Each structure stands twice: as C-alpha cells, then as structure tokens.
Amino acid sequence: WCIGVGFMFAPMHHSAMKHAIGPRQQLAMRTIFNVLGPLTNPAGARRQVLGVFSPALCDVMASALRDLGSEHVMVVHGLDGLDEISVSAKTTVCELANGELTHYEIDPATFGHAHDSVADLCVEDADESAALIRAALGGDTSDRSAKARSIIAMNAGAGLYVGGQADSLEAGIELAMSAMHSGKALQTLEAFAELTQAAGGA
C-alpha cells in the first residue's frame, strides 16, 4: 500500500542520538544537536527543504549538505523567526542546485500568500493541530484555515520544486494548491492516518 508520505522518528534510526534527549531537555536551549539532526537524515535524502532557527545557518547548512552529496536543497529561515517558509514575513533562502549556492529572499506577497501574522496558527495539542490541518486541506473558508493553507502551499510547493516535480517554486505552489482544492491532499492525509493507526495497533 503506497501512500507517498512517510514519517521517521529520529531516535529510532539513530540509536546514539536517543542518549542526548535527556541532556537536551535539561539544557532547554539550542545545541549542536539542533544542527546535527537534519544533517544525519536516515533516509539519505538528496533533495529537501530544511528549516533553520537562524539566518546565519542557511549558508552553513547548504554548504554542508553539498559536501554530503545533496543535489537540490533549499535551506530556509522566516524573518519572523519561523524555521520554515513564512507567510507573514520574507524568508531567507540558500538554495543548492547543480552544485552551486544561491542566496535570495522569498516574499509571500509575490505568490499571493501574504498574511499579517501566523500567531493564530499556534495550537495547544495534537488534536487541535490535526483539526486545523484537516480544515485547511478540506477547504474550510475561515481566515485561520486560509492562512494555514497558504503556509502549507508555500512549503509543500518548495518541496515539490526541489523534488523535481515542478520547474519553479511558483509552479510547485500552484501544484500544492491544486492538490488541496481537488481534495487529493486531504484524501492522502486520511489514508496515511489510517495506515499508521493500523500499524500502531498491529
């Protein structure tokens, strides 16, 4: 049964890293492990969108990923503090393609996805998160769902672009929006949820 979506829990694949969980929680601050984790992707991904907590890391991480054999990567930092492409501020990007690094900014207004704030996208728990995602993918017309749809489209669009499914970021965003409007995105999410719940109960 092929869904086309996967989730890998890092401590299950990097057994040594699980010993760092306790100290990291005690320190309650960013450490070298926040940088090492994405560089030790157990899937060996050669194409990815990677969010970082500081714009200073964009070039550092993209350079490291190039040295590790990556093909097409976007390392991003939202200037409102998000470690992903933001819809409430510009996003700093270092893109690796064809062995070369390119630096630029993404303005969500360019793609029709600018919003004043992402504060109301914060959730209290997993149930609220799941409900918000389902509402966004399902076409709910509230402002909150529209904002969630925008941030999903921007980041999924970037993934489609670096993954070779779209020729540009703009085309990737359009593909992502099309998948949501058609219901295909929600259908895939529900199939993934069903599969993982069945596996968890096995």
Regions found by a protein language model. Give the residues of each.
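Glycine-rich anion-binding loops and their surrounding alpha/beta cores
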Residues: 1-202
